[in-house]
């Protein structure tokens, strides 16, 4: 499967599967994984980028270990809503990954996610060096948590309407 919409995630998951969140950077890939109840995002160690084939192999192994059924990937839109070079790079990454996995990708608007995470880490008095180590996986968790919160809101609205 190529890409999916956020609304499709529950139907795409098999029992026991989780959802992964990715924050794609030029030097690292931030990774986070949901709990089985799709309530909480948990950061995982970042993947240091080397070259695509190695990056893909390491990422797919991590996704398999965490029994991931769907991947939510941050789409770094410009503040005005237009797609810039980073969006193109993210879409190209997904296109290149698709032949390597059957896992569906869901694009999620990640505007300001890294800024929000950096502010939170500064607020927790995390040193600059430690922030650099944690920011990409924390951003992936922020992206994934946003998607999980949206799913929760959709389920609640369906329950309230029914």
UniProtKB/Swiss-Prot annotation:
Q: Which Pfam families match?
A: RuvX
Any GO BP: rRNA 5'-end processing
Q: Which UniProt keywords apply?
A: Cytoplasm, Hydrolase, Nuclease, Ribosome biogenesis
Provide the primary localization.
cytoplasm
Task: Report the GO terms under cellular component.
Answer: cytosol
Q: What compartments host this protein?
A: Cytoplasm
Q: Which SMART domains match?
A: YqgFc
UniProt keyword Nuclease, yes or no? yes
Looking up Gene3D superfamilies in the UniProt record yields: YqgF/RNase H-like domain
Signal peptide (residue range) = none
Q: Give the E.C. number(s).
A: 3.1.-.-
A Gene Ontology MF term for this entry? nuclease activity
The enzyme's main class, written as a single word, is hydrolase
Q: Which PANTHER family match?
A: POLYNUCLEOTIDYL TRANSFERASE, RIBONUCLEASE H-LIKE SUPERFAMILY PROTEIN (PTHR33317:SF4)
**Family from the record:** Belongs to the YqgF nuclease family.
The protein's matches in NCBIfam families, at most eight in alphabetical order, are given as: RNAse_H_YqgF
Functional summary from the UniProt entry: Could be a nuclease involved in processing of the 5'-end of pre-16S rRNA.
Q: Which named protein is this? A: Putative pre-16S rRNA nuclease
Q: Which organism is it from?
A: Brucella ovis (strain ATCC 25840 / 63/290 / NCTC 10512)
